[in-house]
Each structure stands twice: as structure tokens, then as C-alpha cells.
Amino acid sequence: MTFWCMSILLIVGFLSKSELCEAQLSDEATLVAINRELGVPGWSSNGTDYCTWVGLKCGVNNSFVEMLDLSGLQLRGNVTLISDLRSLKHLDLSGNNFNGRIPTSFGNLSELEFLDLSLNRFVGAIPVEFGKLRGLRAFNISNNLLVGEIPDELKVLERLEEFQVSGNGLNGSIPHWVGNLSSLRVFTAYENDLVGEIPNGLGLVSELELLNLHSNQLEGKIPKGIFEKGKLKVLVLTQNRLTGELPEAVGICSGLSSIRIGNNELVGVIPRTIGNISGLTYFEADKNNLSGEIVAEFSKCSNLTLLNLAANGFAGTIPTELGQLINLQELILSGNSLFGEIPKSFLGSGNLNKLDLSNNRLNGTIPKELCSMPRLQYLLLDQNSIRGDIPHEIGNCVKLLQLQLGRNYLTGTIPPEIGRMRNLQIALNLSFNHLHGSLPPELGKLDKLVSLDVSNNLLTGSIPPLLKGMMSLIEVNFSNNLLNGPVPVFVPFQKSPNSSFLGNKELCGAPLSSSCGYSEDLDHLRYNHRVSYRIVLAVIGSGVAVFVSVTVVVLLFMMREKQEKAAAKNVDVEENVEDEQPAIIAGNVFLENLKQGIDLDAVVKATMKESNKLSTGTFSSVYKAVMPSGMIVSVKKLKSMDRAISHHQNKMIRELERLSKLCHDHLVRPIGFVIYEDVALLLHQHLPNGNLTQLIHESTKKPEYQPDWPMRLSIAVGAAEGLAFLHQVAIIHLDVSSSNVLLDSGYKAVLGEIEISKLLDPSRGTASISSVAGSFGYIPPEYAYTMQVTAPGNVYSYGVVLLEILTSRAPVEEEFGEGVDLVKWVHGASARGETPEQILDAKLSTVSFAWRREMLAALKVALLCTDITPAKRPKMKKVVEMLQEVKQIK
């Protein structure tokens, strides 16, 4: 009997071993077929063990393939064959270019625990076959093009810990059975078309930490049950149609770091239990119907960096206790019914960057201590009842980008100290007050200012000629004052509508219709006066000429000697770079197939030599780094490491890893990073042909290579496709410009700087103008009035790039006239009596009729993109479609 038992066991053992070998051969054949279809980098069937291939892990004794990670490889093709790897437990296909329907055969991967198909272009419905994956713990199909409802067949996935379906076109309601997923920690379904109520059953999910449902059409109340288990850390419900009150139970979740419930229809008061949430970092409840007083309990949330209660019905005074929030960076209380004085308690805050108290009923005076806040960039106090003088200490706000004091009851004169605010860029608004006296000439020092409004005051005297120093000025308004004399000859003034100067009875000259009435005799006298001065100057000049000539020769010799010494010193410095190289705090290369080729120490060393610098942009300088392996990478050195990066280093790294999986043919993704001291270096693929700015505006210096129209159109389409993809995955670019349209070895356009919108504040999902003002010439006009970087704003900036491509002109040129940029110059062509053909680069448009016809069609697209009204601009997806149609014009 024993013999027979042993024999049976041996036979079974041999069979199992045979089956194991057969399974291994089957997996290997499947992987070879997958590689043939997808072309996976680093996979080779030349006798190597497939278990060592990049992105693969096998089980015990290299038995079966249990993990397949092809994330971020920009792969295309059919992925159905993957379903033949029946022992898979972990499948990550995120960040590729896979399209079509998700294979239903994935439902046969019965061992699967982790499935990530996000950041692709899958279409159709969510396969009901996923309901067969009973062991699934993580399920992510976000940022695709999926439609339909969340299928009920998924309700049996009781082990789910992460359930992410965001960024699709899903409709229907959130299934009630989500509340039965007892292990659920993360549930995200934002940016879909979901309707109905948030299921009360979600309150039964004891492990829920993150709930993000923003940008849907959800209705009903916020279920109080979601707070009662006490583990919730992030709640994002913005941009829905939610009603009712914020439940008092919110205070149970002491670990909550972010509450975002703005853009809903919520009512009632903010519960005082909010003070129990000691870890709260962000609280956004703007654009609701909340009422009552702003509760002082917010002061107990010591980590709070953003408090946004704008556009509600709050009344009462601003709690002085808010001054205890030493980490507060943005305080936005605009559009309420707050009264009383501006509390002095928080005016010494070392971190406050934005203070928006506009459109309330505040009274009292502007505290002179207001500018003791060293980081303040945005000060909005307009539309209140503030009285008194503008304090002279306002000049201490040297970092301000925007100052809004309009529609108050301010008196006195405009302090000349405003001229010290040299960073003022977006707007200076002093309109609708009772200011008197003359305009201080010091305003002319504000050479970055885009918008100036001093209308509807009691200002007297003439407009100072020194205001011509405001070289960036686009919009001005001097109307309804007591100004007199001629309007200075300054292009921004003459290009402004006459309404900007009306209501000043004694003001004359263009753009006003009233002439200043100078006589010919006076003109003649002035001419003779000028001639006399010229004669005197000529005599003096001839006497000085000899002296200057001798001096110049001496100086040239001295300068040459100094330069030679400096050059020698620089050589010594560069030779000592290796000895002084700082220690690396953190660093990584995200792509496995590049890790061996990139030396992080060599990366740091390369950025310490000026000879390696390729370019300097709005946020960073770019260096060329040659690795010991011979590989060349581009290294982006951030100009100044943002506070949020240093405070949220782990979040920054996760954000970079996520962005490294953003695979698109027309995007430059980060491939790694290095952090040392307070410096962040971002690694990218080296692109040898520079950027679009160099191609268009410097090619005239290189007549041997001029980009023709087909190449330019291809670049325009590529850049548009890259930007459209960013918008699809809910990323707003912060600096769309021709210098950020980079060119690979085949002159294919790829959009750079995509990570900046996240790295300026990686802990937040939104980008605000308080982080960036953009590149001059590309800034949409509405940014002077709004505080949000938007998709329509990106479209405008892209339109400027397209105009550059069509006209070969820079965004700002002296030829346009002061205060006139490329957009205004193009849109004003008809008023100048010019035809659209005259706007185009004649070197291209006159080559052939076909080229001219395509260029005129593309010009129409550019004009739509640069419409002054954001709502009238097309979406980038539509821009791509229109430009592709241009390519097909016969």
C-alpha cells in the first residue's frame, strides 16, 4: 500500500513539474509576442531569462510572471495578449498611448490584485468582466476617455482599497454599493458627468482617507457619516451642486489636511468644531451661500496655509485670532458682507502672500503696518468703505504684483512712494476714490505694470511725461478727474480709447478729439530754440571729441587686461568645482532603462559650469550634462526652490514620478531629479535643436537654414496636441511660450515646463496667478483682473505662439509701438488698412498659393485663440482639430 501511495505521489510530482515547465514556456512565448506587438524597451529574447526583463517580476523559483509594469513608456498597440499571463498579480500600464476598448479578457486575470490603466486613451465602457477580479485591491482607470455608468458587476470587489475612475466621461450616479467596500481607503471619481447624491453608505467605510468627487453634477447634502469614522484626510467636493450645511461631524476627523467644498450651493454656518482639525492645511469653501460669522476657531488650525471663503454671505468682523496662523499664505475673504477695520493682528505675518478682502463693507483706514509682511504679492482691498490717506509706507510693499484699492473713500494724494513698488505688474487700481493733487512722476518707474486705473478721482495738473517709463503698460484709465494739458505722446495713451481720458475738461490731444491749439508761431519759436541748442551742443561736442577718443583707447586696454584676468580666474573656479561639490540630499532616475547611464554626481557638477548653460527661462536655467556613459541629458535648475517644494519634498517626488508617466509624443516629461541644499534639478531628455524662439527669431541670422511653412505648421500642430493632452489630464501650463516649445532631432515639437504648475505648490491641485505671472507678451489680458491660471488663458498664450509662427515676429517689438504687443498689432490690422496677407511672413506666404491659403486658415485659428473674451476662445482639443484641417486644405 505504501509503495502505491509513493508511486502516485511521484507521478503527481512529475506531472506538476511538467505543467510548471509548460506554463513557463507559455509565459515566455506570450512575452515574446507582447514585445513583438509593443516594442518594449529593454526586452530581449536573445537567450536571457525573461524574469530579468525590465518591469517584470516572477514568482518563487521564477515560476510564473506575477508583475508586469510598463508604466510611462509611451507604448502603443494592442494589449490583449497580456491577458494570457494568467498568474499576474500586478499590472501597471499607466502613462502610455494605448487606445481602443479595454480588453474584456483582462477579467480572466483571476490572481490580479493591482490594476492601473490610467493616463491612456481607452474608450468605451468599463468592462463588466472586471467583476471577476475578486482579489483586486487597487483599481485605477483614471484619465482615459471612458463613458457610461460604473457597472454594478464591480460591487463584488470587496477587497478594494483604492478605487479611482476620475477624468473620464462617466455618467449615472455613484453606486450605493461603494459604501459596502469596507477596506476602501481612496475613492476618486472627479471630472466626470456623475449625477445624483453622494451615497450615505460611504459613511460606513471605516478606512476611507481620501474622497475626491470634484467637477461633477452631484446634488444633495454632504453625508455626515463620511466624517464619523474619523480617518478622512482629504475631502474634495468642489464644483458640484451640493446643498445643505457642512456637518458638525467634520471636527471628528482631526487628521483632515484638506477640505475643498467650493463652487456648490451650501448654506448655513461653518461649525465651530472646525477648530478640532489640528492638521488642516487647506480650507476652500468659496462660491457658496454660507452665512454667519467667520469662526475664530480657525485659529486653532495652526498648519493652515490657505483659507478661502470668498463669494458667500459671511457678516461680522474679521476675527483678530486669525493673526495666530503663522503659516497662512493666502487669506481670501472677498465678496462677503464683512465690516469693521482691517485687523492689525495678522499684518506681521511672515508667510502671507495674498490678502484679498475686496468687495466687503470694511471701514477704517489702511494700516501703515500693512507692508510689514515681507512676502506679500497680492493686496486686494477694493470695493469697501475704507477712508483716509494711502499711507506712505505702501512703498515698502516692494514684492507686490497687484494692488487693488479702487471703489473706496480714500482721500489725500497718491504717495510718490508707490514708485518704489518696482515689481508691480498685474494692476494698480486707485479708481473711484476721492484722491486729489497731481499724479506723481514716480509712477513712471513702474516699468513692469500692465494696467493703471486712476479714474473717477479729483486729480489735478497734467499727466507727467515721465509716465513714458511705464514700458509694459497696456491698459490705462485717467477718466473723470480734473487733469489738464496735453496727453503725452506715448503709444499706450494714443492707442487707448478716448473714454480712458474723457471727463477731464482741460485735457487735450490724442486720443481725445480736442486739439491743444498750439499756434504756428509757437511751433516756429520752439524749432529755433531747438536749433540753438543743437549749435551749442555741436561746439561743445567737437571740443570733447578728442578727449573721449583718447580715453576710450586707454579704457579698452584696461578692460582687455581685466577680462583676461577674469577669464583665468573663471578657469580656476571651474577646475575647483569638483572639490566644492555639495552633498546630494535626494535623487532618482524614474526610468529603469536609463538608471545605469545617468550619474547624479555628474549631473550636479555639470550645473556648476556656466559653459554648460543652454538657456534661461522664466522659472529655470537649463544645462547640458554629459554623463560618463556618454549619454547626454538636459538639466533644469529651478531659479529658487519654492517653499512648498522644501516643505513637501515627498509630495514633490511623487508628483514628479506621476508626471514621468505622462506619456505623449509632444510633451517633455521628467526622467529624474536631484535635490541638494535648497536646489532642485530636474532631468529631461536632451533635445538638440533648441526651441521655437531660436528657430523663428534667430534663423534669420543663419540663412543656411530657414524653417519653411510645412515645418512650422507641423510644429504648431504638435505643440497644440501636447497642450490639449495636458488639459485632458487636468494640468494647466504656467508658461506657454515659444521658448517652451522644444524641438527634437527631427524638429518635432515637444512642450516643456509641464511640471512647473505642480512643483510651485505640489500639495495643491490648482494653479493660481499668485504663483506665477507668466512670460511677458504671452499673458492673457484677463489675468490682470482674475487670480486664476486657466485653460482659456493657456489657449490665449498658444495663440500668441501661433501668431509668432505665422508672422515671424516676436510677442513684443519696438515696431509695434509702446504698449502694443503682437496680439494687438494683428487684431488692429484692419484699422490700419492692412489685409491679412500683409500680416503674414512674406518670405513664406509668397512661395505658393497653397502655402498662403493654409497660412490664412491658420491665422483664423490664432485670432480665435487670442479673443479678448476667454469664453469665446476654443478649447485646445478643438484647436488641434482646426489645425489638422488646415493641413488637409488642397
Swiss-Prot record:
Annotated keywords: ATP-binding, Cell membrane, Glycoprotein, Kinase, Leucine-rich repeat, Membrane, Nucleotide-binding, Receptor, Repeat, Signal, Transferase, Transmembrane, Transmembrane helix, Tyrosine-protein kinase
Catalytic activity: L-tyrosyl-[protein] + ATP = O-phospho-L-tyrosyl-[protein] + ADP + H(+)
Signal peptide: 1-23
SMART domains assigned to the protein according to its UniProt record, in alphabetical order: LRR_TYP
Membrane topology designation: Single-pass type I membrane protein
Compartment(s) of residence: Cell membrane
Record carries keyword Transferase: yes
One Pfam family cited in the UniProt record for this chain: LRR_1
Enzyme's top EC category: transferase
Cross-referenced PROSITE patterns: PROTEIN_KINASE_DOM, PROTEIN_KINASE_TYR
Record topological domains on the Cytoplasmic side: 556-890
Glycosylation positions in this chain: N46, N61, N78, N108, N140, N171, N180, N276, N289, N303, N363, N429, N477, N498
Transmembrane segments: 535-555
Residues involved in ATP binding: L614, S615, T616, G617, T618, F619, S620, S621, V622, K636
Tissue: Expressed in the vascular strands of cotyledons, the shoot apex, hypocotyls, roots, leaves, stems and flowers.
Active site (catalytic residues): D735 (proton acceptor)
Stretches of the chain found on the membrane's Extracellular side: 24-534
Gene Ontology annotations for the cellular component aspect, listed alphabetically: plasma membrane
Entry EC no(s): 2.7.10.1
LRR repeats mapped onto the chain: 67-85, 86-108, 110-132, 133-157, 159-181, 182-205, 206-229, 231-254, 256-276, 278-300, 301-325, 326-349, 350-373, 375-397, 399-421, 422-446, 447-469, 471-492
InterPro entries in alphabetical order: Kinase-like_dom_sf, Leu-rich_rpt, Leu-rich_rpt_typical-subtyp, LRR_dom_sf, Plant_LRR-RLKs, Prot_kinase_dom, Ser-Thr/Tyr_kinase_cat_dom, Tyr_kinase_AS
Molecular function in Gene Ontology: ATP binding; transmembrane receptor protein tyrosine kinase activity
Family classification: Belongs to the protein kinase superfamily. Tyr protein kinase family.
Cited PANTHER family: LEUCINE-RICH REPEAT RECEPTOR-LIKE TYROSINE-PROTEIN KINASE PXC3, LRR RECEPTOR-LIKE SERINE/THREONINE-PROTEIN KINASE-RELATED
Described purpose of this protein according to its UniProt entry: Leucine-rich repeat receptor-like protein kinase that may play a role in vascular tissues development.
Protein name per Swiss-Prot or TrEMBL: Leucine-rich repeat receptor-like tyrosine-protein kinase PXC3
Organism phylogeny: Eukaryota, Viridiplantae, Streptophyta, Embryophyta, Tracheophyta
